[in-house]
């Protein structure tokens, strides 16, 4: 059983590192000249990772694509919040995390994460599960972009049953929600945790299909909007809305909490934060403006794949 456990870790790791390579190449192609800078890190007796960060690009103001493979004698609290019965178990975890903060305010910020855990006190019967998904955070809304994003997500999910997309879309809407602001972080996407309801091979296949669908979902949006004209007003609104991203990641994000509780590399954990951000107390958008439309038409729960969008 120990060999089977290690085979799972190896198989998932090979896929995630390959996906990291593909994602970085695709974004570097959009940039033209800027490149991701790689940092290899290790945690003594705890694993390590491969952090790739692109800064001050023409299209991407800051973006990170990170891979990590870590292990320990006890799962951090963030990993056992929903399952206290496995608290104290030894574990191994692998994950790929991506956050892209574009320069142009008309290009949405995007996040993706794919992770695998295996834990147990008994080597003969370890617990394993997958988690992850992807979500989109626009600053200026375009109906066609939102529909494209969700239709690609649905197409990937539908191979595993028609109930999967609505379930994981609803979970995404629930998770990426700022309770203290009473608003969602963006227009959502997919989110799932503790996925082990199928056999390992099928669960892993689901992860691979989602991972492979990410560029299809996001790149056309980036390509269509990266040269959209903008001015100081749009840039200031982008920086203001980025504040919500910071608030969510520091207050609610379980991945951030897991990394900090585990004692991972802080710079890699916090690469999700935007490089520039502003807060404006009591700010309200001008009625009828593009900024107001974001709140009225996009930062609401919607069925983006239906004809009406209701």
Swiss-Prot record:
Q: Please state the Enzyme Commission number of this protein.
A: 1.3.3.3
Q: What domain of life does the native source organism fall in?
A: Bacteria
Q: What class of enzyme is it?
A: oxidoreductase
Which annotated residues bind substrate? 97, 113-115, 263-265
Q: What is its main location?
A: cytoplasm
Catalytic residues (UniProt) = 111 (proton donor)
Residues annotated for a divalent metal cation binding in this entry: 101, 111, 150, 180
Q: Which GO terms describe its cellular component?
A: cytoplasm
**Cofactors demanded by this protein:** a divalent metal cation
Give the UniProt subcellular location, in the record's own words. Answer: Cytoplasm
InterPro entries noted in UniProt: Coprogen_oxidase_aer (IPR001260), Coprogen_oxidase_aer_sf (IPR036406), Coprogen_oxidase_CS (IPR018375)
Keywords noted in UniProt: Cytoplasm, Heme biosynthesis, Metal-binding, Oxidoreductase, Porphyrin biosynthesis
- Kindly indicate whether the keyword Transcription belongs to this entry: no
Metabolic or biological pathway, per its Swiss-Prot or TrEMBL entry: Porphyrin-containing compound metabolism; protoporphyrin-IX biosynthesis; protoporphyrinogen-IX from coproporphyrinogen-III (O2 route): step 1/1
Please tell me whether the keyword Transport is annotated for this protein: no
Reactions catalysed:
coproporphyrinogen III + O2 + 2 H(+) = protoporphyrinogen IX + 2 CO2 + 2 H2O
Q: Name one GO molecular function term.
A: protein homodimerization activity
Q: Where is this region: Important for dimerization?
A: 245-280
Function of the molecule? Involved in the heme biosynthesis. Catalyzes the aerobic oxidative decarboxylation of propionate groups of rings A and B of coproporphyrinogen-III to yield the vinyl groups in protoporphyrinogen-IX.
Subunit relationships: Homodimer.
Q: Which family does it belong to?
A: Belongs to the aerobic coproporphyrinogen-III oxidase family.
Protein name according to UniProt: Oxygen-dependent coproporphyrinogen-III oxidase
The coding gene here is: hemF
């Amino acid at each position: 059983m120990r060999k089977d456990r290690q085979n799972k870790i190896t198989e998932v790791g090979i896929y995630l590192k390959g996906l990291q390579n593909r994602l970085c190449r695709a974004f570097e192609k959009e940039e033209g000249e800027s490149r991701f800078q790689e940092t290899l890190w290790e945690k003594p007796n705890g694993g390590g990772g491969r952090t790739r960060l692109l800064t001050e690009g023409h299209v991407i103001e800051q973006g990170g694509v990170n891979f990590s493979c870590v292990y320990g004698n006890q799962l951090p609290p963030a990993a056992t919040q929903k399952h206290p019965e496995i608290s104290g178990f030894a574990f191994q975890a692998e994950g790929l995390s991506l956050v892209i903060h574009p320069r142009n305010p008309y290009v949405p910020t995007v996040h993706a994460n794919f992770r695998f855990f295996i834990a147990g006190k008994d080597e003969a019967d370890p617990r394993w599960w997958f988690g992850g998904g992807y979500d989109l955070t626009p600053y200026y809304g375009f109906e066609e972009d939102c529909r494209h994003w969700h239709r690609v997500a649905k197409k990937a999910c539908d191979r595993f049953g028609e109930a999967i997309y609505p379930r994981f879309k609803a979970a995404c809407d629930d998770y990426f929600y700022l309770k203290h602001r009473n608003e969602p972080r963006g227009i959502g996407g997919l989110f799932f945790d503790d996925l082990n309801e199928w056999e390992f091979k099928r669960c892993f296949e689901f992860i691979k299909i989602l991972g492979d669908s990410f560029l299809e979902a996001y790149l056309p949006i980036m390509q269509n909007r990266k040269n959209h004209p903008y001015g100081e007003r749009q840039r200031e609104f982008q920086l203001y809305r980025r504040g919500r991203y910071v608030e969510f990641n520091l207050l609610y994000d379980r991945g951030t909490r897991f990394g900090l509780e585990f004692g991972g590399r802080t710079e890699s954990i916090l690469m999700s934060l935007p490089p520039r951000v502003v807060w404006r107390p009591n700010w309200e958008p001008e009625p009828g403006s593009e900024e107001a439309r974001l709140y009225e038409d996009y930062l609401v729960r919607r069925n983006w794949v239906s004809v009406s969008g209701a």
